Amino acid sequence: MIVVVGQFRFAPERMDEARAVMRKVIAATRSEDGCIQYNYGEDVLDPGLIRVSELWHSRAQLHAHMQTPHMATWQSERVALGLSERSIAVYEAGDGTAL
């Protein structure tokens, strides 16, 4: 399983616009082959900070995701919205156990 975690930031005054754009990319991505989870969450204590968490069946499927038209659109829209402080990492995980 592939785990993607990270964060990025929008100016708090741009968050209404950013939410509309994020909803589109999240909905499209969740329907992709190999996507187990795809989530963006707003930090409650830090306005404008978005936490990213994704789970994919394979690196190949994650790579295919990065080549989709909706990701190309997201990449240009997020720049236009002033995305900053982007930090995303990819990990390979073994079998998980419940806490």
Enumerate the language-model features and the residues they cover:
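Short, well-ordered beta-strand segments in beta-rich or mixed alpha/beta enzyme
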Residues: 2-9, 39-66
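Short histidine/acidic/glycine/proline-rich micro-motifs that form metal-
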Residues: 9-10, 95
